[in-house]
Amino acid sequence: MMIMRKTHPLAKMINHAFIDLPAPANISGWWNFGSLIGMCLIIQIATGLFLAMHYTADTLTAFSSVTHICRDVNYGWLIRNMHANGASLFFICLYLHIGRGIYYGSYLYKETWNVGILLLFTVMATAFMGYVLPWGQMSFWGATVITNLLSAIPYIGPDLVEWIWGGFSVDKATLTRFFAFHFILPFIVAALAMVHLLFLHETGSNNPLGIPSNCDKIPFHPYYTFKDLLGVMIVLTLYLSIVLFFPDILGDPDNYTPANPLNTPPHIKPEWYFLFAYAILRSIPNKLGGVIALVLSILVLALFPLLHTSNQRSMTFRPISQFLFWVLVSDLFILTWIGGQPVEPPFILIGQVASILYFLIILVLFPIAGLIENKILKW
């Protein structure tokens, strides 16, 4: 008799994706982040669903409904803190996942990579709209500033902004539609994640050496199911430590003040995971130029497969590219720091230099390093 997981139509799909999937024998802990992002998505959808049961998307009651969740709902404080910090965990895992993809040349799986970029944009949109919902000061002013950037688009810009707002300013209509979109987008993210996996399983996983691993494969279960489970337990421990001991460490104190359109906070800034892009936006004095740079800061990822000049896939044996990679990582930390600082000297200049360096490394220095390394190795 055949095993059911190999014959049943539904079980067969799960079997091919998570049980009998042939996986490279040498993939490291850096390959754990895919499953961790999946875990984050499940946590966010589950906690978000329970929050939505008690939240009201109305400008008059949104802030007090969040207060009600934290004070009066059973374990509401826990659900709210898990959801708020779950977003930070989500982006930490996403950025590490992308960094792994760049370091080990995973971007050469073009379809998987491009769906991944689409996923990043969708998750960013979801997180931005979610940040508006508590209707605190930073929620309101963040929504006002970021949506207003669209007015820089020539000809259609001003009309587009009013269309998104549903009026002449960020108000009840904006909050209601942001709640609707924030609720539906995670399910679109889940669907895109399945497409991401579908494309990945067409080619099989990459590995740290960046060479074909067809001659050395092992079944996903039990080896990588338990390896992923270890990663889940470690990350959950760190995550719950933040949630239970330091729930407000990553938030903005201004968001504990109800939204007031008549009072602007001294420093308007997004959540920490958008600060690098915000710094790039602010480093260009022109509004349209800033918006273009903001979009390109993420869209530039799509150019990685086209700019790959090395004859080796991975950076494992490429010291010049490795050096540039870690300079890029350091540069992103500097941009994140600058994004949270006021627009005044010396932060303006540091932000401009870091922004130029960001694009310079990706568009110019990485391809040149690849060619130099080919020459050194006489390939």
Curated annotation (Swiss-Prot):
SUPFAM superfamilies assigned:
a domain/subunit of cytochrome bc1 complex (Ubiquinol-cytochrome c reductase) (SSF81648), Transmembrane di-heme cytochromes (SSF81342)
The record's section on InterPro entries has:
Cyt_b/b6_C, Cyt_b/b6_C_sf, Cyt_b/b6_N, Cytb/b6-like_sf, Cytochrome_b, Cytochrome_b_C_euk/bac, Cytochrome_b_N_euk/bac, Di-haem_cyt_TM
Q: According to its UniProt record, which protein family does this protein belong to?
A: Belongs to the cytochrome b family.
Q: Name one GO cellular component term.
A: respiratory chain complex III
Q: Name one GO biological process term.
A: mitochondrial electron transport, ubiquinol to cytochrome c
Domain of life of the native organism: Eukaryota
Q: What does this protein do?
A: Component of the ubiquinol-cytochrome c reductase complex (complex III or cytochrome b-c1 complex) that is part of the mitochondrial respiratory chain. The b-c1 complex mediates electron transfer from ubiquinol to cytochrome c. Contributes to the generation of a proton gradient across the mitochondrial membrane that is then used for ATP synthesis.
Q: Which residues bind heme b b562?
A: H83, H182
Q: How does it assemble?
A: The cytochrome bc1 complex contains 11 subunits: 3 respiratory subunits (MT-CYB, CYC1 and UQCRFS1), 2 core proteins (UQCRC1 and UQCRC2) and 6 low-molecular weight proteins (UQCRH/QCR6, UQCRB/QCR7, UQCRQ/QCR8, UQCR10/QCR9, UQCR11/QCR10 and a cleavage product of UQCRFS1). This cytochrome bc1 complex then forms a dimer.
Q: Which cofactor does it need?
A: heme b
Which coarse location class describes where this protein primarily resides? mitochondrion
Keywords of this entry: Electron transport, Heme, Iron, Membrane, Metal-binding, Mitochondrion, Mitochondrion inner membrane, Respiratory chain, Transmembrane, Transmembrane helix, Transport, Ubiquinone
Protein's UniProt name: Cytochrome b
UniProt-annotated binding residues for a ubiquinone? H201
**Co-factor binding comment:** Binds 2 heme b groups non-covalently.
